[in-house]
Amino acid sequence: MDVNPTLLFLKVPAQNAISTTFPYTGDPPYSHGTGTGYTMDTVNRTHQYSERGRWTTNTETGAPQLNPIDGPLPEDNEPSGYAQTDCVLEAMAFLEESHPGIFETSCLETMEVVQQTRVDKLTQGRQTYDWTLNRNQPAATALANTIEVFRSNGLTANESGRLIDFLKDVMESMNKEEMEITTHFQRKRRVRDNMTKKMVTQRTIGKRKQRLNKRSYLIRALTLNTMTKDAERGKLKRRAIATPGMQIRGFVYFVETLARSICEKLEQSGLPVGGNEKKAKLANVVRKMMTNSQDTEISFTITGDNTKWNENQNPRMFLAMITYITRNQPEWFRNVLSIAPIMFSNKMARLGKGYMFESKSMKIRTQIPAEMLASIDLKYFNDSTRKKIEKIRPLLIDGTASLSPGMMMGMFNMLSTVLGVSILNLGQKRHTKTTYWWDGLQSSDDFALIVNAPNHEGIQAGVNRFYRTCKLLGINMSKKKSYINRTGTFEFTSFFYRYGFVANFSMELPSFGVSGINESADMSIGVTVIKNNMINNDLGPATAQMALQLFIKDYRYTYRCHRGDTQIQTRRSFEIKKLWEQTHSKAGLLVSDGGPNLYNIRNLHIPEVCLKWELMDEDYQGRLCNPLNPFVNHKDIESVNNAVIMPAHGPAKNMEYDAVATTHSWIPKRNRSILNTSQRGILEDEQMYQKCCNLFEKFFPSSSYRRPVGISSMVEAMVSRARIDARIDFESGRIKKEEFTEIMKICSTIEELRRQK
């Protein structure tokens, strides 16, 4: 039957239909090829916004640097990065005055974190620029390589396992005259394959020592590698994002810890909270403005958009902020926190892979690496690329571009939020000393501004003053993209507010469907997503029931597990029909074994195995959940697993789902082809790390331990823990004397081996 789509909306208030206009169904666009062009765009734009600043040369690396701070006051409307130090410091002072003790308290909290954080904090995170190999690696591998190189160069403070000591090594390394590193290279040779008698290319991995002088090492330590941001919806053009190396990461982490601590105490900050908590926080600010705008005042809200937030921020400004925030703190703490902004003021952007050329007539392709862009003849490039390269050439050193102004995407989200909130804080009547006043919300580069005044002229004056104040702090509110409404209707971080937040359900659309982990996890995640959306996103019962039916259908097609009594023929139907016929209680079969679906919107919280357990034949139960069955996954299955859910917007969310270990919880094996590449050593390293970490977790189940503070290695911590546990178990009679003696003997042997090593 044909449904007239307008009928769907007859009962729906217009603002609730906002979701239907979002570009969130279907696959998001991905980037292909090189990100070099996007990176050059970023570098060139950033310099253009600060072009009237002062040029200097870095004495260590020889890199030309542009400093726009305290530069000429900006022209109206043009985005610019000329932040004025005294204005930023004054905004900080007023922020502190409105929140007495906020900086002091946050510093104390951060100091505690700094002293307790272990170096393994840096293994979190995805791709990281590995300066030893000059390319991206998984974070854990990049950290291991860095520590290995440090050790072979006589830097061993990091062996304490504390992050702060690793950072001491980083500081030391920058003073060394040279650093020796091990690099990998590939040898290719043509050999005849014994089986097929064809010629094949064999790759072998060689390692060689390489010495980096101080200048080359500094350039690498200050390098941010760049990639193209994938899966951005609603944009025509791609853009570049940066991934910093291990030298920078630790320092950034501490700065962000301090800024996060401050943001938690600011009612206008949309970070670090999320979800319903964030909505509640924001609703409070709106409520305050609406209740305070008495009958004599009118209230308007700007849904704000800033032009090129990152490219106009400046690390030197962040340094000024940190210097102010930590002004009464111990010297060592101030030094640790000021290093990140100093490194960012001297950062280099790696231009990525370079360009690929192909000649149609000669059928050959050749790669022009970024290192060659400084010297290659420009006649091979089209006009726009030629302009980019000409512009960037004065900034190039060894395939990286000097990029002093600007902050690449996502590096100092918390600290830049503090800067934004400090302007919102200036809107109180006692600061504006006029009839208008403002407040608002800030989350990284996104903001909403609420202005109250007796009349429209006052509103206009307030907005103008806000706009100009922003300019003085290097923030450029876009007049084209921001829009103003009566307070009560606005959008902030993709939350739509209309006398309360409306659910923007389309944002969640990408997370519906079959995840593709395995039959067990997929069923569990699928129903959990539906359940969560009923709780958080206004997914009504009828729609949820429909979503569930669609999900089951999708699931059956994905895993070819149509019901045993269906006519649909697939590769699995023969086995499934056989099982169906043999089974006495057919309702007990899992959907993935051709059983019926027993889910409805009332029982989504129950794992399928539990839901059907009482209905199952006994021998089916035995096969399904028997730990001796080789197909039941033997990895310790936590009762709760985490799935990473990608909403259409914002960061990936961690979602918990219940996991029951059955024959369906298999884990696919790694692709073989990786084992023949240079990545193989890395894989082995990763597995070794994994094993060590798993072992450590066994000794210290997360419920029972506070991280070992103080200086002990993982092995020492585990041995001492084993001894304590053994003694307790022996004294309470849980283990026999022989077992106790054996454990003690093993512990002593381990310590002995460590001493000999």
Swiss-Prot record:
EC number(s) stated in the UniProt entry for this protein: 2.7.7.48
GO molecular function, one term: nucleotide binding
Location of the region described as Disordered in the Swiss-Prot/TrEMBL record: 53-82
Protein function: RNA-dependent RNA polymerase which is responsible for replication and transcription of virus RNA segments. The transcription of viral mRNAs occurs by a unique mechanism called cap-snatching. 5' methylated caps of cellular mRNAs are cleaved after 10-13 nucleotides by PA. In turn, these short capped RNAs are used as primers by PB1 for transcription of viral mRNAs. During virus replication, PB1 initiates RNA synthesis and copy vRNA into complementary RNA (cRNA) which in turn serves as a template for the production of more vRNAs.
Record-given protein name: RNA-directed RNA polymerase catalytic subunit
Gene Ontology cellular-component terms listed: host cell cytoplasm; host cell nucleus
Species of the source: Influenza A virus (strain A/Wilson-Smith/1933 H1N1) (Influenza A virus (strain A/WS/1933 H1N1))
Effect of R239A: Complete loss of RNA synthesis in vitro
Catalytic reactions on record: RNA(n) + a ribonucleoside 5'-triphosphate = RNA(n+1) + diphosphate
Quaternary structure and interacting proteins, as annotated: Influenza RNA polymerase is composed of three subunits: PB1, PB2 and PA. Interacts (via N-terminus) with PA (via C-terminus). Interacts (via C-terminus) with PB2 (via N-terminus); this interaction is essential for transcription initiation. Interacts (via C-terminus) with human PKP2 (via N-terminus); the interaction competitively inhibits the interaction between the RNA polymerase subunits PB1 and PB2.
Keyword annotations of the record: Eukaryotic host gene expression shutoff by virus, Eukaryotic host transcription shutoff by virus, Host cytoplasm, Host gene expression shutoff by virus, Host nucleus, Host-virus interaction, Inhibition of host RNA polymerase II by virus, Nucleotide-binding, Nucleotidyltransferase, Phosphoprotein, RNA-directed RNA polymerase, Transferase, Viral RNA replication, Viral transcription
Ranges in coiled-coil conformation: none
Subcellular localization: Host nucleus; Host cytoplasm
Post-translational modification note: Phosphorylated by host PRKCA.
Transferase as UniProt keyword: yes
Domain RdRp catalytic: 286-483
Outcome of substituting K235A: Complete loss of RNA synthesis in vitro
Record's compositionally biased regions (Polar residues): 55-64
Motif mapping: Nuclear localization signal: 187-195, 203-216
Any Pfam family: Flu_PB1
Family: Belongs to the influenza viruses polymerase PB1 family.
GO biological process, one term: DNA-templated transcription
